[in-house]
């Protein structure tokens, strides 16, 4: 069991005791707590994208920034054209990104099966959040007109279908890996336990809490450790303090920009609710970030 999964279980145990003590946690408290930890850990894990790939000269750096900003602009155009298409694209990219971040070390030597596995594994996680908390998803969406309208265009039964389909396919793929690629059974069992813990937390906890636990502890923290080890490998004098100092300015700028846009939404300067504009902002950043992390993880798997 990885140290991150152990941390996850410990935090889940603490939160379950908090629920028993107070019977429930208000949605306002959940939102504030989730937002705080996402800003503390989630945003920093993507703040150094521009430093993770080799950019030796001005031309390569310029190409990187044009590509990065171009993907953001393209995604914004998609959301402006259709919120449904933007949401579907966001779920697909997030699913692939989560799966790739977890399973990149499998190194299956078959790109098609590898990419398909990343997508299915990530989808099994994403739809577990929705499947076990569908009533809360509807409640949160109904709190704002634009999110209510967005969800009204989706057949909620589809979440159940995608939940079962993605999980069944993932299990079949794991069995196939043992047979075809000779992946050790104990490694597959470890991944199955990992998924079981995610499903259990999604079943036990509200949507915001189970997602935040996963995103912070099982996704962002491992990524931060990989990034730190990367910089440490390049410079053996690189310290944790250096890493924090390196992340801090980019993270603070990102947080301030997000707060500013949220303020504009709250004061109706931007004609989107805070939840919807938050989803859009996370979506447009996730697209280029997933490309960078994919390339970065490829270098780690070599």
Regions found by a protein language model. Name each.
Residues 12-17, 67-76, 98, 192-201:
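Hydrophobic, membrane-inserted alpha-helices
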Residues 16-29, 265-269:
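Short, hydrophobic transmembrane alpha-helix segments
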Residues 37-46, 91-103, 216-227, 283-288:
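Alpha-helical transmembrane segments and their membrane-interface exit regions
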Residues 44-55, 96-108, 172-184, 227-228, ...:
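C-terminal ends of transmembrane helices
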Residues 55-62, 66, 73-152:
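Membrane-interface helix-loop-helix junctions at boundaries between adjacent transmembrane segments
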Residues 92, 116-137, 159-177, 193-207, ...:
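Alpha-helical transmembrane segments of multi-pass integral membrane proteins
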């Amino acid at each position: 069991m990885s140290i991150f999964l152990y941390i996850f279980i410990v935090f889940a145990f603490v939160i379950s005791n908090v629920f028993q003590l107070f019977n429930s946690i208000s949605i306002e408290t959940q939102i504030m707590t989730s937002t705080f930890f996402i800003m503390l850990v989630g945003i920093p894990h993507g703040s150094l994208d521009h430093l993770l790939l080799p950019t030796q000269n001005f031309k390569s750096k310029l190409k990187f920034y044009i590509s990065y900003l171009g993907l953001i602009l393209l995604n914004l155009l998609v959301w402006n054209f259709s919120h449904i298409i933007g949401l579907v694209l966001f779920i697909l990219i997030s699913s692939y990104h989560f799966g790739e971040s977890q399973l990149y070390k499998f190194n299956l030597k078959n790109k098609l099966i590898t990419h398909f596995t990343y997508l299915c594994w990530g989808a099994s996680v994403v739809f577990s959040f929705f499947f076990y908390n569908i009533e809360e998803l509807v409640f949160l969406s109904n709190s704002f007109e634009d999110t209510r309208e967005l969800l009204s265009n989706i057949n909620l039964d589809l979440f159940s279908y995608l939940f079962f389909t993605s999980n069944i396919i993932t299990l079949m793929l794991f069995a196939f890996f043992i047979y075809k690629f000779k992946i050790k059974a104990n490694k597959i069992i470890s991944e199955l336990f990992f998924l079981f813990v995610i499903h259990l937390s999604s079943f036990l906890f509200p949507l915001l809490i189970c997602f935040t636990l996963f995103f912070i502890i099982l996704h962002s923290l491992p990524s931060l450790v990989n990034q730190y080890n990367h910089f440490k490998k390049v410079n053996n004098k690189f310290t944790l303090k250096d890493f924090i100092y390196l992340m801090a300015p980019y993270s603070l700028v990102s947080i301030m920009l997000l707060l500013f846009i949220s303020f504009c939404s709250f004061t109706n300067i931007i004609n989107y609710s805070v939840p919807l504009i938050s989803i859009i902002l996370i979506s447009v950043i996730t697209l280029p970030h997933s490309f960078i992390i994919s390339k970065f993880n490829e270098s780690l798997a070599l």
